[in-house]
């Protein structure tokens, strides 16, 4: 009986570990944490100025990615790989 219970515990742990998916904050508003699709194991925050930057601030994009998005000269890009590691910059402590 103990062997069966131990086997079930090990199988459960292995199955849960194989099924791990990352949680990232995503835009557009409202900003919610969502499960990333398989293969997308990074969270990212991308910020840039558009034509209305002086009046409303930078455009902020949050999401999941398989690789860190390319950074253009006028953009700020941050990537991370833990659950909910990309909060909206205005909401960071």
Swiss-Prot record:
Q: What is the lineage of its organism?
A: Eukaryota, Metazoa, Chordata, Craniata, Vertebrata
Q: Which cysteines are joined by disulfide bonds?
A: 24-43, 36-64, 49-53, 68-79, 80-85
Question: Known InterPro entries for this protein?
Answer: Snake_3FTx, Snake_toxin-like_sf, Snake_toxin_con_site, Toxin_cobra-type
Q: Where in the cell is it found?
A: Secreted
CDD domains registered for this protein in UniProt: TFP_snake_toxin
Q: Which UniProt keywords apply?
A: Acetylcholine receptor inhibiting toxin, Disulfide bond, Ion channel impairing toxin, Neurotoxin, Postsynaptic neurotoxin, Secreted, Signal, Toxin
Q: Name one GO cellular component term.
A: extracellular region
Family per record: Belongs to the three-finger toxin family. Long-chain subfamily. Type II alpha-neurotoxin sub-subfamily.
Identification of the protein by name: Alpha-elapitoxin-Oh2a
- Pfam families to which the protein is assigned, alphabetical: Toxin_cobra-type (PF21947)
Provide the tissue specificity.
Answer: Expressed by the venom gland.
MF annotations from Gene Ontology: acetylcholine receptor inhibitor activity; ion channel regulator activity; toxin activity
Q: Which organism is it from?
A: Ophiophagus hannah
This molecule's function is given as: Binds with high affinity to muscular (alpha-1/CHRNA1) and neuronal (alpha-7/CHRNA7) nicotinic acetylcholine receptor (nAChR) and inhibits acetylcholine from binding to the receptor, thereby impairing neuromuscular and neuronal transmission.
Q: Where is the signal peptide?
A: 1-21
């Amino acid at each position: 009986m103990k062997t069966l219970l131990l086997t079930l515990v090990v199988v459960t742990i292995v199955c849960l570990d194989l099924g791990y998916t990352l949680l990232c904050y995503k835009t557009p508003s409202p900003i919610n944490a969502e499960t990333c699709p398989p293969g997308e194991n990074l969270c990212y925050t991308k910020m840039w100025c558009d034509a209305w930057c002086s009046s409303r601030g930078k455009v902020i994009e949050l999401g999941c990615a398989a690789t860190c998005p390319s950074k253009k000269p006028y953009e700020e890009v941050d990537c991370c790989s833990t659950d909910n590691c990309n909060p909206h910059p205005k909401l960071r402590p």
